[in-house]
Amino acid sequence: MPSLSSLCPDIVLIGAGIMSSTLAALLRELDPSLSMVMFETLSDCGQESSYAWNNAGTGHAGNCELNYTPQRADGSVDISKALAVNTEFDLSRQLWAHWVREGRIADPAAFVQPCPHISLVWGAENVAFLKARYEAMVAHHCFADMEYTDDPAVIAQWAPLAMAGRDTTQPVAATRIREGTDVNFGALTHALTASLKTDRSVSIHYNHRVTDLTRTEDGRWRVTATDTESGHAITVLTRFVFIGAGGNALPLLQKSGIPEATHYAGFPVSGLWLRCTDPAITRQHHAKVYGKAPVGSPPMSVPHLDTRVIDGKSCLLFGPYAGFSTKFLKSGSWTDYFRSLTPKNIIPALTAGKDNLGLLDYLVKQVIQTNEARFQALLDFYPTARPEDWSKVVAGQRVQIIRPDSGLHGKLRFGTELVKNADRSLVAVLGASPGASIAASVALQVVQGCFPERLVEGDWLPRLRQVFPAYGVDLTQDAAACATLRRDTAQVLGIASEAG
């Protein structure tokens, strides 16, 4: 017979990816007495956007992603977004280091590896931009370790494959931060859920699709999940629901009926990678090398040639190549997008489409792009690449947020966003990049935004300070605290850089 805590849990989490597993593990740190139920449609955790080959595993820290540092009209570079992403990743480092110290995660090398983050550009205009970006960033303590060079010989030491066979008459430049990371968010999700399953107050139900999410008269949430194999349904009552279901978060949010979600819509974007697993090639490249997106293309199109370490093996990934699919998840239905349109969000969706014809044009061109054209993009990064060494891999689905910015006029937003109802009893994660890299930041925002009454000295606050040693400290302003924190977390996680 099911226990009372499993029928009336304190917390229900929908989705068993990196977002839900991170929040569940953090809540357990703050209050081990909380009972939690997690529902996942698939047969295991971390199989959608958290799965290693469904995301770039960059450990987004604003080091190399040029779309986070736009150039102003006067030629100066705005680094505010890069700083925000950079210090959000510090939250992830603090949380992961805490779990390693506490034994929640046995081996950090199973999910995080040191990997330099490099920005590479060519052409006089792009070189001038990168130099201006470097000067703006290296002046701030968060990026003080950034290196810059326009010497092809030095770049060849940093990223040999990127320079072999390159036209040396063309201006080229690069920046590097040695202490970057490659993160296997699928492996991290598995480690967290394995730890959660040892707790009798946590119940995880795989092969269970949430089919109903309604409010009861007493203010609780009735959540019904149906076993996708047997058809048997489970119904639980809870005071708090977290929707961390990736692309499927929007339909679930709509199912809840909260007014805050009324006009939200989603725009699904699929993706492709090229992958190389030949050790003779992969051993020659150890870095995340990000380029500059073509003029007029969306932020999601920033090309990069990445080292990935998956299941202990080093691989190379290049992309992303965008596409269009009406699915909200890789395992979803072709009808997902159409079923998400309602009388209240179709106008925001249409106006967002009208305002983003450039994006639509880009996606159409990407969809009809030939394999030869895709490979040409790789040759821009790796001039001596051979087609026979690379295979095509379908990436995870992303659902970009569309929300009204004035009246019913919809605005397409790139990023990750939390949507919660007025009494803070339900919250959902919407959006895409930086996504998994800021799971710790998202979890902390949920705690702060939905449980403020518990963040006091006699309750969760002291423990929260233990989990996040720099809690309440603005790392963008406190250089000493930032340096200490990064040194300590690098040592615990085994990601300290080596000179060279």
Swiss-Prot record:
Asked if the keyword Cell inner membrane belongs to this entry, the reply reads no
- One annotated GO molecular function: 2-hydroxyglutarate dehydrogenase activity
Q: In which pathway does it act?
A: Carbohydrate metabolism; tricarboxylic acid cycle; oxaloacetate from (S)-malate (quinone route): step 1/1
Q: Which domain of life is it from?
A: Bacteria
> What keywords does the record list, in alphabetical order?
FAD, Flavoprotein, Oxidoreductase, Tricarboxylic acid cycle
Q: Which Enzyme Commission number(s) are on file for it?
A: 1.1.5.4
Q: Which InterPro entries match?
A: FAD/NAD-bd_sf, MQO
Name what cofactor the protein needs.
Answer: FAD
Q: By its UniProt entry, which SUPFAM superfamilies does this protein fall under?
A: FAD/NAD(P)-binding domain
GO biological process, alphabetically ordered: tricarboxylic acid cycle
* UniProt-listed Pfam families: Mqo (PF06039)
Q: Which reaction does it catalyse?
A: (S)-malate + a quinone = a quinol + oxaloacetate
RNA-binding among keywords: no
Q: Which family does it belong to?
A: Belongs to the MQO family.
* Entries under PANTHER family matching the protein: L-2-HYDROXYGLUTARATE DEHYDROGENASE, MITOCHONDRIAL (PTHR43104:SF2)
* Matching NCBIfam families: mal_quin_oxido, PRK05257.1-1, PRK05257.1-4, PRK05257.2-1, PRK05257.2-4, PRK05257.3-2, PRK13339.1
Name the record gives this protein: Probable malate:quinone oxidoreductase
Record the organism: Gluconobacter oxydans (strain 621H)
UniProt gene name: mqo
